[in-house]
């Protein structure tokens, strides 16, 4: 946001609110800032520089522009999911301004974002998931720091169902009981700074333990608390994790797209397939509402339906 008009100050106040009071991550703040800068440019072009002057018609027109391409302006139409994300930022801004007494009415309250098509999460079968993890390398006698780290990251990603940001944000002190015969636990910090404790099994504990003993000391040139380190001694990034997952999937010969979130989807789906209660899975995933977790039950029902259609004599 370039100018210092009323809208600029109000947007900055909202972003500060998200950071300080809501505990939004740096990634979320960056996305909201980009979306609101786009909204601010539209308002400025419309001659509006204060949220008190914004009408429902302004917000409606902005939503329409997001969905409409304009070659003269070099503007491409956004996908429904991108429009929904942008409008979430706009609606949040106006809701905040109303609650804070900046505006008397919420101009965006009645402007609903498009419903993106429901995409079911894609889980890997258990054997393929194990193949991807093993493709990261690292044998019992391996001394290569990168391979030991990559194997530990993938083992822990699948064992805990962590989000990518949660995994790369782990510190050494977030681990507990790696030497316990029944497995250990990890403290994950999710959205809004909420903490949860997730148990992890022996394969992950052993892989992380091997990394801590045989690899991390060689990488820890800067000191610091981060669990997973890059070659320069800094905390690994989400992009590094994405690359590790992508390379391991290719090595394992998996054709479908595999991302760190595929590990989370597989974690949840395999638990439910194994008979886990959905409320337990909700807690392990860190979902605030069980409704979010229920999408995984649709995946397992689809699997059951496919097996039934394939095997039942009266299915055809």
Where are each of the predicted segments found?
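Conserved catalytic core of the tyrosine transesterase superfamily
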Residues: 1-316
């Amino acid at each position: 946001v370039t100018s210092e008009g009323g809208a600029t100050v109000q947007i900055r106040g909202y972003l500060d609110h998200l950071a300080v009071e809501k505990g939004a991550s740096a990634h979320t703040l960056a996305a909201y800032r980009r979306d609101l800068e786009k909204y601010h440019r539209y308002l400025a072009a419309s001659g509006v520089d204060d949220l008190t002057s914004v009408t429902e018609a302004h917000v409606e027109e902005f939503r329409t522009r997001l969905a409409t391409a304009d070659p003269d302006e070099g503007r491409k139409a956004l996908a429904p999911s991108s429009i929904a994300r942008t409008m979430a930022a706009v609606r949040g801004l106006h809701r905040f301004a109303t609650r804070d007494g900046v505006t008397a009415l919420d101009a965006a309250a009645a402007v609903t974002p498009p419903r993106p098509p429901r995409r079911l999460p894609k889980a890997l079968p258990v054997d393929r998931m194990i193949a991807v993890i093993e493709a990261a390398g690292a044998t019992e006698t391996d001394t290569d720091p990168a391979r030991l780290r990559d194997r530990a990251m993938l083992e822990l990603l699948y064992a805990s169902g962590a989000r990518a940001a949660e995994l790369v944000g782990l510190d050494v002190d977030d681990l507990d009981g790696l030497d316990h015969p029944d497995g250990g636990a990890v403290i994950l910090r999710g959205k809004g700074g909420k903490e949860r404790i997730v148990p992890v099994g022996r394969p992950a504990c052993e892989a992380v333990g091997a990394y801590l003993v045989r690899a991390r000391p060689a990488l820890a040139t800067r000191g610091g608390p981060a669990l997973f380190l890059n070659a320069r001694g800094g905390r690994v990034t989400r992009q590094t994790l994405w690359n590790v997952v992508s390379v391991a999937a290719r090595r394992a010969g998996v054709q479908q797209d595999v991302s760190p979130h595929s590990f989370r989807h597989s974690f949840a789906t395999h638990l439910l397939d194994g008979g886990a209660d959905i409320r337990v899975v909700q807690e392990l995933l860190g979902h605030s509402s069980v409704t979010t977790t229920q999408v995984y039950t649709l995946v397992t029902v689809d699997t059951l339906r496919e097996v039934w259609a394939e095997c039942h004599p009266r299915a055809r």
